[in-house]
């Protein structure tokens, strides 16, 4: 009986490799991660624009969302206009010394090989890592 349940259950993907030009595949994968969130989403990504905000809007109602990024006047405007009409996405200025990108979905941490907005334009990987969200966030202070 357990074998049948395992056979019928979808496999949990913990890593994915996207080739150059696989923009839709990468976007769909990130979208599925965002939709899985029950409590919180935290994105750590130096390069965010309105495409990222559209992606994060796929989260369920009541899921808190925070983005750690470097923001320019345009990014500030994107967040301001977004938050006037949609569920708030909080923003926190990111240090210049942060290179890697992370997507935290509840208590899972995913390492992104490219910015969420650019995923699939070039070869990139998304992989679930065994860090706690608190461990990653502690390095942002």
What are these regions (language model features)?
Residues 1-26, 36, 47-141:
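PLD/PLD-like phosphodiesterase catalytic module centered on the HKD motif
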Residues 30-32:
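Exposed extracellular interaction/assembly regions and N-terminal maturation sites
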Residues 41:
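Catalytic histidine site
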């Amino acid at each position: 009986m357990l074998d049948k349940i395992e056979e019928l259950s979808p496999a949990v993907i913990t890593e994915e490799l996207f080739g150059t030009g696989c923009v839709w595949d990468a976007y769909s994968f990130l979208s599925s991660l965002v939709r899985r969130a029950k409590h919180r989403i935290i994105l750590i990504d130096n390069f965010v624009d309105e495409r990222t905000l559209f992606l994060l809007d796929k989260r369920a109602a009541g899921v808190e969302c925070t983005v750690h990024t470097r923001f320019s006047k345009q990014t500030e405007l994107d967040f301001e206009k977004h938050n006037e009409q949609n569920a708030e996405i909080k923003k926190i200025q990111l240090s210049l010394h942060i290179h890697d990108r992370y997507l935290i979905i509840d208590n899972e941490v995913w390492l992104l090989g490219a910015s969420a907005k650019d995923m699939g334009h070039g070869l990139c990987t998304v992989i679930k890592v065994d860090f706690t969200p608190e461990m990653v966030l502690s390095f942002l202070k």
